[in-house]
Amino acid sequence: MKKFLSVILVLTMVLSMAACGKKAEETQPVLSVAGTMEELLNKTIEQRPVEFMGGVIPVDLTDSSEDGLWALKSYTGLDSAEKITEAAAFEPMMGSMAFSMVLVRTVEGADSKAVAESMKSGIDTRKWICVEADDLKVAGFGDVVMLIMLNSDSGMTAQSFVDAFAKVAGFEPEFVM
């Protein structure tokens, strides 16, 4: 009888300890868009064609010279490449047309919304001097941030490019600002 009571007491203690145990934290995996920034820009243009001759321009994140930092700021709006691992832009190759579509991939663990806010506040919509972008959107797709700016007189909308990239990514943006 004593053994039986001892076994019941031990089982009760074990069960109560298990019930008080900490639950495993459930973390949402960060969505990732497959492909390089260059590939993704080209696929986006296939989804939403433009009526001008444009091209993809990779951004060299390792160039810390004055020209390299100017290019980073001019394309992405960022002062530093510390929170991104890859960047590329799609812009017109000739003429003065206000259009720039930029994709950056954030480093693992970076807050993509904070990167997007820095891009939006840091970008110069008059970087072309004689023309200005008046339609600007920044959207987050997992670890990829998209900045699209253009002049609405062109007949295009920034939202149409966000929608095209959503088709390429395979999921809707987590945020659009």
Which stretches of residues belong to each language-model region?
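Intrinsically disordered, low-complexity sequence elements enriched in Ser/Thr/Gly/Pro
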Residues: M1, C20-G21
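Sec-dependent signal peptide recognition
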Residues: K2-V10
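C-terminal motif of bacterial Sec signal peptides marking the signal peptidase cleavage site
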Residues: L15-A19
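Soluble, non-membrane globular domain cores that form compact, hydrophobic packing
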Residues: G21-S100, T106-M177
